[in-house]
C-alpha cells in the first residue's frame, strides 16, 4: 500500500522580516480496493506432509471488481543466484467461500514449471469477502532441518488493479520424530529346535530424537527367548512371558535409555533436493523354537 506524505509551510512578517516555518510531516496510507491475507490450519510443517492454506480477499471499494485472480508462489525460493526451487506441490481441491458461505470449487491452474498456482475468482461484489481454501504438500525441496521455514506469498489482482497486492506467510519446520518399524524372521525355513532370530529395524525420518522407545511383540509359537541385541550389542534387559509370549524391551525394571537418533537431513547446494538418511537401530531377539 502506498503512503501519502504532506508538509505545509507558513510565512509571516515579524519585526520587518519575513519568516517561513514548516509544519510537521503528515502521512496517510492509501489503501487500494483489494486487501489480502493468508494463513494455514497447521502451525508448522513436516516433510512429505499436507498443509491447508486459506487466502482471504476483501473488496473494500463501493463497486464490484472484475476478473479477480489470486496467485500463490508455493514458497518458491532461490537455491543459487540463478536457480529456483519450489518446496510445495499443489494438490487441491480449492474451495471458495463468499461472505462465509460455501459456493463450491474454484478453478485452479498450476503453471507448467509448477512454481505457482492461480485461482480465478471472477467478480467480487463491493464490500464482499472471498476465502479460498486449498491443500498443498511439502516435497523434496522443502527444507527439513530444525528451524527451517517455508515462506509462501499470496497475491491478488483485478481489472483496474494492475499492481498485485501481496501477503507473505511463514511456516516453520516442526521439531518431530517420525519412526517406522520393519520386522523379519530368519532363517527361513527354521528347523524345529533351532534358533529363530526376530529382527526389528527402527528408522527415524524426523529431525528430532525419538526417546523413551518401547518395543512390544507377542511371539507365537512361544519361543525360549535367549538374548536381545541392539545394533549387535547384547542387551538382555527385556521382559518376556513364557506363558503368553509377550515380549517387552526395555523391560519394566530396565534403566536402559532406548532412543532412536534423528535423521540426517541435507540439501544439495546445486539442485536443492533434500535428502533424508534415517536414524536407525536394529534390534534382534534370538529364541529357540
Q: Which residues does each PLM region occupy?
A:
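Exported/extracytosolic protein signature
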Residues: 1-289
